[in-house]
């Protein structure tokens, strides 16, 4: 498995992209190796388990959750993954196959407290809420504490709010950018593979951009040079996001200019998107992904320029403090969406908080 995987890594490296996330078959082989690891491969195997398997309800996540559950139930063992680490790794899987095991552990003398700490930060519990509520009704103090934590919105308040001042470097594309510029239809076959698909972003010649391979690969050199400045990148355009492929277009932009998501391979969130005009459905999709997205005049903002964004004051300045643009947020809720790592996360989290307050244990 390791030989095949390293061969895959080398192939992807030649393409300038990271390896694909592990699928269920590779994850099954990884689980076998974790129980009897080849000498010297321990750290590598643990990294694969921690960072290269999609969370949630992916088939590979099912295999991962099953293995970690077996560890905590004494049905499997590994010299690399002990029980406390298994609980921590289950907690990092966002929601889905991990939740039931964490709830079961609330009755475990040794691991209950650690499991509760993980559950406090998971909002994707859905109907499993009732399982925790039932334990609380039966007198389980940790179950009560989890529901109180959700009621207090600790899942939200533990995250950093949007800063009052953000220093960023600009990547600006003049004119209209439609979703086909960001996610070309003729490259639709690669959309599930976000890093590979993103290479086609802006692959056609246009003012200010130098595609690496016109018609095939976009301006990777220019993007790399901007990112090497070491600041957050503000993606800026005159008109941004017209067209229908808003999800894959957003994925492409954020692959280059967003933030890595812990434990989620090959997908980014966050980022900054500014447009004189932004298509509503693209705007909404950026919100879903946790981007700080807003409309503002951009004629005084140029590629390579270092700017300071004052989100609450509604202004953008250059480094000397000269005002380049003034704006108004569509809604102050966008600050909560960014803090929650996305609009969908905020909606789900708020719903959980409301349910918890209805049965809150004080």
Regions found by a protein language model. Name each.
Residues 2-31, 36, 337-338, 346-347:
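Amphipathic alpha-helical packing elements
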Residues 2-5, 126-156:
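Eukaryotic acidic, Ser/Thr-rich intrinsically disordered low-complexity regions
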Residues 15-20, 42-59, 73, 80-95, ...:
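Structural detector for internal amphipathic alpha-helices that build alpha-solenoid repeat scaffolds
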Residues 24-32, 55-74, 94-107, 124-136:
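Amphipathic alpha-helical scaffolding segments comprising HEAT/armadillo-like alpha-solenoid repeats
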Residues 143-192, 345-358:
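N-terminal, positively charged, Ser/Thr/Ala/Gly-biased leader segments
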Residues 177-183, 239-252, 333, 337-348:
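Conserved phosphate/anionic-ligand binding catalytic regions in large, soluble enzymes, centered on
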Residues 189-317, 321-326:
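Feature captures the catalytic cores and cofactor-binding loops of soluble hydro-lyases/lyases
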Residues 362:
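Conserved small/polar residues in nucleotide/adenosyl-binding loops
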């Amino acid at each position: 498995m390791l030989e095949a995987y390293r061969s895959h890594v080398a192939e992807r490296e030649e393409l300038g992209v990271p390896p694909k996330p592990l699928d269920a078959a590779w994850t099954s082989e990884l689980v076998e190796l974790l129980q009897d690891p080849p000498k010297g491969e321990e750290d590598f195997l643990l990294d694969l388990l921690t960072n290269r398997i999609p969370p949630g309800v992916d088939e590979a996540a099912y295999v991962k959750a099953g293995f970690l559950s077996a560890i905590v139930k004494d049905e499997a063992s590994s010299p690399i993954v002990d029980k406390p680490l298994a609980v921590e790794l289950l907690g990092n899987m966002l929601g889905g196959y991990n939740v039931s095991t964490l709830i079961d552990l609330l009755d475990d003398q040794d691991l209950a407290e650690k499991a509760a700490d993980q559950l406090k930060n998971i909002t994707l519990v859905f109907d499993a809420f009732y399982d925790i509520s039932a334990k609380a009704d039966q007198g389980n103090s940790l179950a009560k504490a989890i529901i109180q934590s959700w009621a207090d919105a600790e899942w939200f308040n533990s995250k950093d709010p949007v800063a009052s001042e953000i220093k960023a470097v600009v990547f600006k594309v003049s004119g209209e950018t439609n979703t086909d510029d960001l996610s070309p239809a003729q490259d639709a076959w690669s959309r599930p593979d976000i890093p590979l698909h993103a290479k086609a972003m802006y692959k056609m010649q246009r003012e200010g951009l130098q595609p690496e391979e016109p018609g095939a690969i976009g301006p990777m050199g220019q993007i790399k040079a901007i990112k090497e400045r070491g600041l957050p990148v503000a993606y800026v355009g005159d008109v941004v996001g017209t067209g229908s492929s808003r999800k894959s277009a957003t994925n492409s932009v954020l692959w280059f200019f967003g933030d890595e998501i812990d434990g989620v391979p090959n997908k980014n969130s966050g980022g900054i998107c500014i447009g004189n005009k932004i298509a509503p459905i693209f705007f909404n999709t950026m919100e879903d992904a946790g981007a700080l997205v807003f409309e503002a005049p951009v004629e005084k903002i140029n590629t390579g320029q270092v700017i300071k964004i004052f989100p609450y004051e509604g202004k953008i300045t250059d480094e000397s403090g000269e005002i380049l643009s003034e704006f108004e947020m569509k809604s102050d809720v966008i600050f909560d969406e960014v803090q929650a790592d996305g609009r969908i996360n905020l909606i789900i989290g708020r719903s959980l908080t409301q349910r918890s307050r209805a049965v809150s244990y004080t």
